[in-house]
Amino acid sequence: MLKHDSMQVSQDQPIYSEAPLQLLLFVDGRPKSKQQVQRIRAYLKDLQAEYNFELQIIDVGQQPYLAEHFKLVATPALIKIHPEPRQILAGSNIITQLKNLWPRWQAAVDTYVKLQEDLQERVDDNGRVAQPTSTINSVAVSAELLRLSDEIFNLKQEKEKLLEQLQFKDRVIAMLVHDLRNPLTAAAIAIETLQSNYNPDIGQFQRLKPALVVNLLRQARTQAKTIDKMIADLLQVGRGTDTELIIIPQKTEIGLLCLEVLGELRDRYTTKAQKVETDIPQDLPCVYADPERIRQVLINLLDNAIKYTPEGGTISIAGLHRTTQKVQFSIGDTGPGIPTDNRERIFENHYRLERDEAKEGYGIGLSLCQRIIRAHYGQIWVDSNPHGGAWFHFTLPVYPS
């Protein structure tokens, strides 16, 4: 806020000063500088009784753009903005500097006044006497322009970010709508087959062997879980990454949980003739984690491993009691791997490698995995598979015995 001595002046009502000597005093709210500012103001007030000059007092906390405009590094600071050249006094001895410079400033003022008198006959095209360009009002306008420019820049960035988020959500929703058709159709066919062959009078399936009934039920359940994951992904996109991730940790057998997820994905990796190798020790301790959240992590990592491993390739799963406090779980594949430069970025929300733009997926799986693992005070990272491909590792706390 600009102040004329002790009088407050509104930003939208700037002062138009014609005083030959114009000064700005920059102050802040620090208690340590309060006494120094009072001494400077008292000295300037004494000078005003004898000399004609305009003094504006500026609080840098309320007008940071003016401080930026003058490139100030310390306060209090006294600036002579008119007549030119501009001079800045700062430090603990402002009054001493002012006493030394005041005669020169008055000499400059006398020269300026004499020059103005000589220019009275020189007018501009509108019949007005030319005014000095470096005035208190022009400084306030410059500071306001700096502030508005900053705001416009920030608003443009926010707009671009929001547009990017909206475009991403539109793309994900369109992909989900398309992808939901396959599991919905498969589940519907399985259920309709079971329904059309079920005789409620005898409580049995006709013309269907027990093994086929079990297979159809498994297929319907698997497709329902696929749909559930897609809906969870859609909800995650809608919520964004700024919402708090709620977890309900409990004693969890991560090895057993992983085998359950593998069973749900069996049709996918057997269709590609992929081999699954597991190295999960029987004495691997339970972890303290939210089983549904960790299921999401396992589904995402195994889904990626199946997706990127070629037909006939190998998917590896390993558990390791890394320390007395942590269990490490790892999932490896024999796919194309992750370039070294991208191993941090792949965990960013919406980020996808250029080579994967044509593949199915929404660019939120690994980001969600990282959020879940971090919510459990664990770590997740990726490195190279010695035989080609990638290894994803994550840690979880051991359940206290």
From Swiss-Prot:
EC number from the UniProt entry: 2.7.13.3
UniProt keyword annotations, A-Z: ATP-binding, Biological rhythms, Kinase, Nucleotide-binding, Phosphoprotein, Transferase, Two-component regulatory system
Phosphohistidine modification, residue list: H178
Catalytic activity: ATP + protein L-histidine = ADP + protein N-phospho-L-histidine
Molecular function terms, GO-annotated: ATP binding; phosphorelay sensor kinase activity
InterPro entries, per the entry: HATPase_C_sf, His_kinase_dom, HisK_dim/P_dom, HisK_dim/P_sf, KaiB_domain, Kinase_SasA, Sensor_HK_Regulatory, Sig_transdc_His_kin-like_C
GO biological process, one term: circadian rhythm
Keyword Membrane in annotation: no
Class in the EC hierarchy, top level: transferase
CDD domains given in the database record: HATPase, HisKA, KaiB_like
Keyword check for Phosphoprotein: yes
Signal peptide, first to last residue: none
All residue ranges annotated as the Histidine kinase domain in the record: 175-400
Subunit structure: Homooligomerizes. Interacts with KaiC. Participates in the KaiABC clock complex, whose core is composed of a KaiC homohexamer, 6 KaiB and up to 6 KaiA dimers. SasA and KaiB(fs) compete to bind to KaiC.
Protein function: Member of the two-component regulatory system SasA/RpaA involved in genome-wide circadian gene expression. One of several clock output pathways. Participates in the Kai clock protein complex, the main circadian regulator in cyanobacteria, via its interaction with KaiC. KaiC enhances the autophosphorylation activity of SasA, which then transfers its phosphate group to RpaA to activate it. In addition to its output function, recruits fold-shifted KaiB (KaiB(fs)) to KaiC to cooperatively form the KaiB(6):KaiC(6) complex (independent of SasA kinase activity).
Domain notes: The N-terminus interacts with KaiC, while the C-terminal histidine kinase domain autophosphorylates and is probably responsible for self-oligomerization. The N-terminal domain stimulates the C-terminus to autophosphorylate.
Name assigned to this protein: Adaptive-response sensory kinase SasA
